[in-house]
């Protein structure tokens, strides 16, 4: 890609990692610099290639030879050698992206009902994520967003059926790339339905968005794990746990509940 440009200039590109500033060869397809303002868009060489940021920064040991920085989110860390086999590596990349997307949606869905009920005064019968589903077995059923005019669910079988159909259609479009629906890429279908705003039209922006997606997806997966543990230990939702901690950090923290994991406690 860089060979298509006959001229380049050396610029100083600020990076967000350890406050470093490095000299690099400016390339319009690789580095996007807003010269009219102090805000810089990260160069893709910060996240891709042999000189990318590593998992321990400057203290990282030699990274495995198969982790070349070709793919987004590769920080050179694979202690267990899970990605040594190319086929396993490809499968794991796909699994991570898909699970990260589900986790981002899940984390958003876990927090939103509590936020809406507390500060927007939306009347949910049960805003806590791990308790809300049981409302479908109540006499009045389950109202989506607390509004009976949206979806008034009274049958768990009907909900599961619609879920399978809707998710199956989306996954089918994603994998098969039907004409006019997607572009045939399993992980990044694109097209007017999967990228209606054209966010991935520019290759530099697309490469940067892939990194942002995988980083936020990993964070969301850890968040969901934290929500699961909180639900088991405290029996409360994530927002209520957060507010309790902010109200009294000394009394409401992980250490205060650590004994609940001890046998016989």
From Swiss-Prot:
Kindly list the residue ranges recorded as spanning the membrane: 150-170, 219-239
Q: What induces it?
A: Repressed by high-light (HL) in a CAO-dependent manner (at protein level). Reduced levels relative to CP43 during high light acclimation, thus helping photosystem II (PSII) structural re-arrangement. Repressed by the herbicide bromacil (BRO).
- Please tell me where chlorophyll a 4 binds in this chain: 216
Q: Tell me, according to the record, the phenotype of the null mutant.
A: In koLhcb3, accumulation of LHCB1 and LHCB2 apoproteins to adjust photosystem II (PSII). However, altered macrostructural arrangement of the LHCII antenna and increased rate of PSII transition from state 1 to state 2. Increased phosphorylation level of LHCII. Reduced responsiveness of stomatal movement to abscisic acid (ABA), therefore resulting in a decrease in tolerance to drought stress. Deceleration of the fast phase of excitation dynamics in grana cores.
Protein residues bound to chlorophyll b 3: 155, 171
Detail which positions bind chlorophyll b 4.
163, 174
Q: Which positions are annotated as binding chlorophyll a 2?
A: 99
GO cellular component term of the entry, any? chloroplast thylakoid
Instruction: Locate the residues binding chlorophyll a 1.
Output: 77, 83, 96, 218
Cross-referenced Gene3D superfamilies: Chlorophyll a/b binding protein domain
What's the domain of life for this entry? Answer: Eukaryota
The record's subcellular location field reads: Plastid, Chloroplast thylakoid membrane
- InterPro entries to which the protein is assigned, alphabetical: Chloro_AB-bd_pln, Chloroa_b-bind
Q: For this UniProt record, give its keywords in alphabetical order, as a comma-separated list.
A: Chlorophyll, Chloroplast, Chromophore, Magnesium, Membrane, Metal-binding, Photosynthesis, Photosystem I, Photosystem II, Plastid, Thylakoid, Transit peptide, Transmembrane, Transmembrane helix
For membrane topology, the record states: Multi-pass membrane protein
GO MF, one annotated term: chlorophyll binding
- Chain positions recorded as chlorophyll b 2 binding sites: 101, 151
- Which residues belong to the transit peptide? 1-22
Which GO terms of type biological process are on file?
photosynthesis; photosynthesis, light harvesting in photosystem II; regulation of stomatal movement; response to abscisic acid; response to herbicide; response to high light intensity
Q: Detail which positions bind chlorophyll a 6.
A: 245, 254
Q: Note how many cofactor molecules are bound and how.
A: Binds at least 14 chlorophylls (8 Chl-a and 6 Chl-b) and carotenoids such as lutein and neoxanthin.
Can you tell me which family this protein belongs to?
Belongs to the light-harvesting chlorophyll a/b-binding (LHC) protein family.
Name under which the protein is recorded: Chlorophyll a-b binding protein 3, chloroplastic
Q: State the organism of origin.
A: Arabidopsis thaliana (Mouse-ear cress)
């Amino acid at each position: 890609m860089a060979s298509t440009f006959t001229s380049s200039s050396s610029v100083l590109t600020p990076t967000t990692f350890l406050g470093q500033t490095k000299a690099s060869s400016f390339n319009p397809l690789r580095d996007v610099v807003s010269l009219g303002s102090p805000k810089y868009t990260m160069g893709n060489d910060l996240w891709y290639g042999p000189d990318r940021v590593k998992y321990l920064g400057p203290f990282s040991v030699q990274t495995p030879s198969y982790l070349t920085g070709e793919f987004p989110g590769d920080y050179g860390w694979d202690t267990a050698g899970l990605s040594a086999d190319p086929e396993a590596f490809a499968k794991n990349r796909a699994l991570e992206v898909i699970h990260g997307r589900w986790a981002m949606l899940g984390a958003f869905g876990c927090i939103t009902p509590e936020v809406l009920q507390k500060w927007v005064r939306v009347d949910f019968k049960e805003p806590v994520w791990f308790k809300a589903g049981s409302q479908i077995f109540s006499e009045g059923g389950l109202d989506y967003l607390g509004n009976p005019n949206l979806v008034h669910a009274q049958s768990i079988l009907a909900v599961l059926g619609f879920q399978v159909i809707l998710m199956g259609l989306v996954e089918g479009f994603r994998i098969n790339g039907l004409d006019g629906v997607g572009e045939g890429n399993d992980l990044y279908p694109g097209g007017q339905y999967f990228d209606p705003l054209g966010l991935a039209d520019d290759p530099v922006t697309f490469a940067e968005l892939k990194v942002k997606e995988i980083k936020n997806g990993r964070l969301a997966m850890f968040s969901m794990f934290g929500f699961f543990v909180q639900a088991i230990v405290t029996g409360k939702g994530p927002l209520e746990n957060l507010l309790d901690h902010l109200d009294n950090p000394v009394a409401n923290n992980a250490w205060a509940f650590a004994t609940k994991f001890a046998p016989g406690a």
